[in-house]
């Protein structure tokens, strides 16, 4: 009984005898608590961060259709969200007008836009792509010579004797 009394007295004063087996769980539990707190703070930081998608590489397709049937590939590229440059220099003017009308309709249906680049070269872009600069189809029609004159001067040149 005196030993129990002495242990209680020493414990009261602050001189308690602690075994190593008792200290080890306290240390490990404090380490576990710190680890848990760190993991919780990391998870809070991760939940606040949002992933920013990398800008996807946009390819610009360049085509030179020969006939009206070739325009289907231009429409497919526009549907897939790819800008298309169309060169109509090697096409008969009447066929070129049909291609231009069809491709403009596709671009309009997809909320895209069209711009004249130079001469008979046009840029068609899907929605979400902005074209900055002068010249579009409205100004193209104003600056172009009438189709009859173009057909006569380009394809049906008459020789004078």
From Swiss-Prot:
Main localization category: cytoplasm
Region (Disordered): 19-47
Keywords for this protein: Cell cycle, Cell division, Cytoplasm, Septation
GO cellular component terms listed in the entry, alphabetical order: cytoplasm
Localization in the cell: Cytoplasm
Keyword Cell division tagged: yes
Regions annotated as coiled coil: none
Any one of the GO BP annotations: division septum assembly
Secretion signal, residue range per the UniProt entry: none
One Pfam assignment: SepF
Compositionally skewed regions (Basic and acidic residues) per UniProt: 21-35
Oligomeric and partner information: Homodimer. Interacts with FtsZ.
Role, per record: Cell division protein that is part of the divisome complex and is recruited early to the Z-ring. Probably stimulates Z-ring formation, perhaps through the cross-linking of FtsZ protofilaments. Its function overlaps with FtsA.
Family of this protein: Belongs to the SepF family.
Protein name in the entry: Cell division protein SepF 2
Gene name linked to the record: sepF2
């Amino acid at each position: 009984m005196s030993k129990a009394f002495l242990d209680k007295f020493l414990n009261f004063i602050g001189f308690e005898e602690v075994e190593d087996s008792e200290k080890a769980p306290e240390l490990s539990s404090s380490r576990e608590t710190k680890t848990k707190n760190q993991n919780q703070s990391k998870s809070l930081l991760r939940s606040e961060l949002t992933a920013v998608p990398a800008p996807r590489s946009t390819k610009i397709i360049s085509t030179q259709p020969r006939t009206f049937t070739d325009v289907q590939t231009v429409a497919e590229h526009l549907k897939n969200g790819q800008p298309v440059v169309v060169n109509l220099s090697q096409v008969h003017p009447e066929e070129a007008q049909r291609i231009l009308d069809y491709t403009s309709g596709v671009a309009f249906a997809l909320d895209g836009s069209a711009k004249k680049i130079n001469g008979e070269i046009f840029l068609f872009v899907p929605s979400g792509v902005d074209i900055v600069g002068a010249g579009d189809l409205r100004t193209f029609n104003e600056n172009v010579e009438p189709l009859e004159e173009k057909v006569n001067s380009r394809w049906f040149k008459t020789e004078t004797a």
